[in-house]
From Swiss-Prot:
Any Pfam family matching the protein: GCV_H
Domain Lipoyl-binding: 24-106
Protein name (record): Glycine cleavage system H protein
Keyword set, alphabetical order: Lipoyl
Stretches of the chain forming a coiled coil according to its record: none
Family, similarity comment: Belongs to the GcvH family.
Lineage, broadest ranks: Bacteria, Bacillati, Cyanobacteriota, Cyanophyceae, Synechococcales
GO terms under biological process: glycine decarboxylation via glycine cleavage system
Source organism (scientific name): Synechococcus sp. (strain JA-2-3B'a(2-13))
Highest taxon, organism lineage: Bacteria
Details of cofactor binding: Binds 1 lipoyl cofactor covalently.
Residues with the N6-lipoyllysine modification: 65
Cellular component terms per the entry's GO annotation: cytosol; glycine cleavage complex
């Protein structure tokens, strides 16, 4: 089964995606990351109001295979946390680009988005790995 990378999203090489809605970025992990992790058993996310910095860890995802840090693709303030994936981590695999989003961030520096890639570029990155 081919993994999907929706074209309306932006991606980073640490396997997070960004969906921009005005000055808010919805951040989650890609289908590739979910596939590589396997069965997800824990998701640790920051609280609302937390300031995150581009390139820094903002949480973690634990699976039966590994514990992986989540890296902020941009800087800003966390304005919403998806408590549903914290309470039911396995649900992240069901819809990573929809109900499986992780956090929403008020974008501090729109220039941060210049370092993201298209779905096509991200697909080339992961398919070449």
């Amino acid at each position: 089964m081919a993994l999907e990378y929706p074209s309306h999203l932006r991606y980073v090489d640490t396997h997070e995606y960004i969906h921009v809605e005005d000055d808010i970025a919805v951040i989650g992990i890609t289908a590739y990351a979910v596939d590589q992790l396997g069965d997800i058993v824990f998701v640790g996310l920051p609280e609302e109001g937390t300031e995150i910095e581009k390139g820094e860890s903002f949480g973690s995802v634990e699976s039966v295979k590994a514990v992986e840090d989540l890296y902020a693709p941009l800087s800003g303030e966390v304005v919403a946390v998806n408590t549903a994936v914290v309470e039911s981590p396995e649900s992240l695999a069901d819809d990573p680009y929809g109900d499986g989003w992780l956090i929403k961030v008020r974008i501090a520096n729109p220039e941060d988005l210049e370092d993201t890639m298209s779905a096509e570029a991200y697909a080339s990155l992961v398919e070449g790995s």
